[in-house]
Amino acid sequence: MALAALMIALGSLGLHTWQAQAVPILPLGLAPDTFDDTYVGCAEEMEEKAAPLLKEEMAHHALLRESWEAAQETWEDKRRGLTLPPGFKAQNGIAIMVYTNSSNTLYWELNQAVRTGGGSRELYMRHFPFKALHFYLIRALQLLRGSGGCSRGPGEVVFRGVGSLRFEPKRLGDSVRLGQFASSSLDKAVAHRFGNATLFSLTTCFGAPIQAFSVFPKEREVLIPPHEVFLVTRFSQDGAQSLVTLWSYNQTCSHFNCAYLGGEKRRGCVSAPGALGTGDLHMTKRHLQQP
């Protein structure tokens, strides 16, 4: 189990460069151990808690403190000329800058914690070291993308290259989550540069374009949240490379909500639909599986 968690964590490098000699194969699934809080109904209360919580977490994590302070120093220059959605705070922009700075390993550590930190609320409270960063980053994506997913327009077609793992679905038509903050690009060539073990082609309804905030804007990055649900529509192999096509259900699914404020892990994954109803999902699934 520990080895599998490590392998999955390596896959969280996403657009960030990682070359491995041996490429393990892991199945795609719903990532049930992911910490997938969406803070529905408690964002304002979490805003009050997050600022002192961030200070506490930075005091215990030197890299988090250094990364946050470095991004904070450049945020005012970055935000000039940006049109920010209502409610978008400096902390949300700084969180994106911290995540996209691949010159250190903080994004990797965050995604490792996200992928393995959702076993229980107790596990999250005791051992998840990025509670404030997770909140600020999730809220940033929610505010940038807006509510309703694809109800406001078509999803983004993006690409994600992974160099450390070959992901394979169990079968076509499965529902899967990426189970982490997943970096992707509007540019297929960029995705190829960051990994050839697996190439994902995705249509995302909840991923947010973060190019304007990114430390590396030329990557044309779209950041996909851990809780978005996708349908596996195609899978093939090109030599040693897995080619996976995922289509968003326009739906998210979370076991946690407001965990820091007392919300326990729910036994089932609670769905939050966008524009499509259940019947529409079934129709879409049948349509997409046809050749």
Swiss-Prot record:
Highest taxon in the source lineage: Eukaryota
PANTHER family recorded: ADP-RIBOSYLTRANSFERASE, ECTO-ADP-RIBOSYLTRANSFERASE 5
Short name of one Pfam family: ART
Principal subcellular localization: secreted
Active site: R160, S183, E221
Keyword match RNA-binding: no
Gene Ontology cellular component terms for the protein in this record: extracellular region
Keyword terms of this UniProt record: Disulfide bond, Glycoprotein, Glycosyltransferase, NAD, NADP, Nucleotidyltransferase, Secreted, Signal, Transferase
Binding site for NAD(+): Y99, R160, Q180, S214
Signal sequence extent: 1-22
Record organism: Homo sapiens
Residue stretches making up the TR mART core domain: 62-252
Enzyme class: transferase
GO molecular function, one term: nucleotidyltransferase activity
Family of this protein: Belongs to the Arg-specific ADP-ribosyltransferase family.
Disulfide bonds: C42-C258
E.C. designation(s): 2.4.2.31
Reaction catalysis annotation: L-arginyl-[protein] + NAD(+) = N(omega)-(ADP-D-ribosyl)-L-arginyl-[protein] + nicotinamide + H(+)
Localization (cell): Secreted
Lineage: Eukaryota, Metazoa, Chordata, Craniata, Vertebrata
Keyword Glycoprotein applies: yes
Gene3D superfamilies assigned to the protein according to its UniProt record, in alphabetical order: Toxin ADP-ribosyltransferase, Chain A, domain 1
Name of the protein this chain belongs to: Ecto-ADP-ribosyltransferase 5
Positions of glycan attachment: N101, N196, N250
